[in-house]
Design a protein with these regions (language model features):
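Class I (Rossmann-like) S-adenosyl-L-methionine-dependent methyltransferase catalytic domain
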Residues: 1-43, 48-95, 112, 116-119, ...
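A conserved beta-strand element that flanks and buttresses the S-adenosyl-L-methionine
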Residues: 104
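Short catalytic micro-motifs in class I SAM-dependent methyltransferases
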Residues: 107-111
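A short glycine-rich, Lys/Arg-flanked "PGG" loop and its adjoining helix->strand segment in the class I
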Residues: 118-130
Length: 212
């Protein structure tokens, strides 16, 4: 069984820029919201090779990413040199001092079982400053793959041993962000074309602010 680091290292080694170079639809939505709320600095946990960070850094934001794969970090430094990228796990974000106005996280939270999801969000809380905004996307229960594999926790399935995917209902997502004040939630249809197959993910997003 691969560790998380080994899994992502192999994937980025084998497939390079897996999801192409264009940012996700949700990153564009987050960009509009961050501008509206006066955000200046953004943390991107699970930043990959920089396809989403580059949208923010090229739009004038001060951007920091954290990514577990060495290969992805190296790709990001070439693809998006304006973003600072730290190599490490999102479950331990003690990579440097300072806090951020906002966090943007694309399709990372659902890759963990419940205890680690809670830990991840606590790590995020510790990295948010006074503005304290967060925009997360996750797999929804409307995903075509929902229910496939071995159920290891409620609404969490392993497509292969050690690779959990949690599928969020809206109620579940809001509950995970109970230490935040929810501003907006919704569904976003995110098209992807990798592995030779075009498909669309049905994601939930939440835009929230750290509770005072």
């Amino acid at each position: 069984m691969f560790s998380d680091k080994e899994f992502w290292e192999k994937r980025f080694n084998d497939e390079g820029k897996v999801w192409g170079e264009l940012p996700s639809k949700s990153a564009h939505k987050a960009l509009e919201l961050f501008r509206k709320h006066g955000v200046k600095s953004i943390l991107v946990p699970g930043s990959g090779y920089g396809r989403n960070t580059r949208l923010f850094s090229s739009s004038g934001f001060d951007v920091t990413g954290i990514e577990i794969s060495t290969t992805a970090c190296n790709l990001a430094k070439q693809f998006d040199p304006q973003t600072r990228v730290y190599e490490g796990s999102v479950l331990d974000m003690s990579f440097g001092p300072g806090v951020f106005d906002a966090i943007y996280c694309f399709n990372t939270l659902h890759l963990f079982c419940e205890n680690d999801r809670r830990l991840f969000l606590q790590e995020c809380l510790g990295k948010l400053g006074e503005v304290g905004l967060a925009f997360f996307t996750v797999f929804s229960e409307e995903e075509p793959s929902f229910g496939q594999g071995k159920e290891v926790e409620s609404n969490t399935y392993e497509s292969r041993p050690g690779r959990p995917t949690h599928y969020f209902t809206e109620e579940d997502l809001r509950e995970h962000f109970r230490d935040f004040e929810t501003i907006e939630t919704g569904i976003v249809h995110e098209p992807e074309d990798h592995g030779g197959q075009a498909h669309t993910h049905i994601l939930r997003y939440i835009f929230a602010q750290k509770a005072a």
